[in-house]
Amino acid sequence: RQRQMCIRDSLKTDEYALSKARQEDILHRSGKNNWTVIRPYITYSEIRLQLGVLEKELWLYRALNGRTIVFSKDIAEKSTTLTYGYDVALGIASIIGKETAFGEAFHITSDESYTWKEILEIYLDTIEKKTGMRPKVLLLDKSPHLEWIGAKWQVILDRYYNRRFDNSKIQQYIDTSQFVRTESGLISCLESFLCHPQFKKMGWGIQGTYDRITGEWAPFSEISIIKDCISYLLHRTVVPPKSKLSI
């Protein structure tokens, strides 16, 4: 019953996955077939490396700056499928202009699946090999994102499921066995990133919440914008965990 209530509540939102599903429904009901749906799931590259629901700015930045990665057992034990972005691009290119692909949906994914715990170990081993430092990890029982309005649906309705995909349909157009192997691809991309690390928006509100959990502090010399300093300080010391999280 609780799961049904969660699904009902999530349907009131415009989360990316729900929005895409609604758009697919529109296409299927259109009575036309001049479309093709691509479902790539999670992709990675030299500039994007995810851990559960965390972008690299929320885990890798912490690791490289000596603070603890905050992850959770409930997600770590689930299986996922990560595909190198270039391979997805090759898959898309393989069906462009093919009439047999009209009116069809394709999962363009790797043949492999790993648990998030295994993905984390790949990251940790690579960072240790490259920097000589093994990052600290705090494994909570439950993801803290469950407590944050707007952030929980990706956990409950995606990362809480084992994600393995049937990619046999796209194999009619491209040999997915030639896709980059997940482990070697992640290692290569992370090593490349570590040579020239560049981070996007850091999400200092979330960083403050993580530091509240771990008992750590980010030096304010890392935070260049006053607004971000205030957000970090509020979430580190004042804002209750169940509030709407500001990044």
Where are these regions (language model features)?
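Conserved beta-loop-beta element that borders a ligand/cofactor-binding pocket
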Residues: 24-49
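Conserved loop-to-helix N-cap of the C-terminal "lid" that shapes the substrate pocket in Rossmann-like
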Residues: 37, 79-89, 105, 116, ...
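Substrate-positioning beta->alpha
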Residues: 51-59, 72-96, 103-104, 187
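Short, small-residue-biased leader/transition segments that mark boundaries at the very start
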Residues: 2-7, 116
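Glycine-rich Rossmann NAD(P)(H)-binding loop
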Residues: 45, 72-78, 106-113, 124, ...
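Active-site helix of classical SDR
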Residues: 19
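Mid/C-terminal beta-alpha module of Rossmann-like enzyme folds, strongest
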Residues: 94-155, 199-205, 211-247
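Non-catalytic, hydrophobic alpha-helical segments
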Residues: 88, 92, 108, 119, ...
